[in-house]
């Protein structure tokens, strides 16, 4: 965990808002997870993905958004429910949500009767959705669409609260996904990793939801965010990326055990 403190002290002065976690965040999660797969899980996943890495396929669920044929999967990326409540007590959407998505993907992958094509598709989705689960604004409020309607400035560029957490904070650190994943992975020992892998999807979602409440209270509409915001919250961003990677590995190892 000492690495997170070092990150704060080393934040660069150059930021980027080009990425649409965003791509980097999802790739970091996939890269970390790949390091902690069992031999059996790695073999099964390698076969399904034709040798491609988890980092490579981690953005697939966002890429298919441009195709109307996949429009029904859009609600699978998130869930919005009232702050201060638990997911299991909240009303559920008839169109599905991220929890239903993860359960569906898991069931398809565990089902011996699922086609190879279905398994490949749902594995790619699962890698992405476990990442989304750890981005707090994917567990935000309905009223502002998980922070998308809260307009802000990131340094001198227009943005919104959702994008700040999707990509602005990550891109601000200006590291490639492999480099960042390696640093985040090496800063956690085996005992800490096992602790972070405790719980289930419901626990992890409610944890993100609690962080969302803190994030909402951290800004005002139209506020200009910069160095001080990055200094205060990059630790949470990095921690969530770590958890996402370790927990993705746990989910995949359980599926392919």
Identify the residue ranges that each predicted region occupies:
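N-terminal, motif-rich segments that launch catalysis or mediate targeting to/interaction with membranes
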Residues: 18-127, 136, 141-257
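Short, functionally critical alpha-helical segments immediately adjacent to catalytic or ligand/cofactor-binding
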Residues: 130
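Acidic beta-to-alpha connecting loop that harbors the catalytic carboxylate
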Residues: 133
């Amino acid at each position: 965990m000492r690495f997170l403190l070092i990150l704060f002290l080393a934040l660069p002065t150059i930021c980027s808002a080009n990425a649409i976690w965003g791509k980097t965040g999802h790739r970091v999660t996939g890269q970390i997870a790949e390091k902690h797969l069992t031999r059996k899980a790695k073999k099964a996943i390698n076969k399904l993905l034709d040798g491609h890495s988890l980092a490579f396929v981690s953005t697939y669920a966002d890429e298919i958004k441009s195709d109307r044929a996949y429009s029904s999967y859009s609600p699978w990326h998130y869930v919005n429910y009232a702050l201060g409540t638990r997911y299991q007590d909240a009303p559920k959407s008839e169109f599905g949500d991220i929890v239903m998505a993860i359960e569906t993907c898991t069931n398809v992958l565990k089902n011996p009767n699922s086609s190879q094509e279905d398994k490949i598709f749902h594995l790619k989705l699962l890698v992405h959705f476990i990442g989304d689960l750890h981005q707090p604004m994917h567990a935000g409020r309905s009223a502002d669409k998980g922070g998308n309607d809260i307009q802000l400035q990131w340094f001198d560029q227009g943005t919104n609260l959702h994008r700040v957490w999707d990509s602005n904070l990550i891109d601000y650190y200006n590291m490639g996904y492999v480099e960042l994943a390696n640093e985040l992975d090496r800063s956690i020992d085996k005992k800490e990793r096992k602790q972070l892998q405790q719980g289930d999807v419901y626990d992890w979602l409610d944890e993100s939801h609690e962080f969302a409440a803190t994030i909402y209270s951290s800004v005002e509409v139209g506020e200009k965010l910069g160095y001080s915001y990055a200094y205060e919250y990059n630790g949470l961003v990095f921690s969530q990326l770590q958890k996402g990677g370790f927990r993705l590995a746990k989910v995949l190892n359980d599926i392919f055990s």
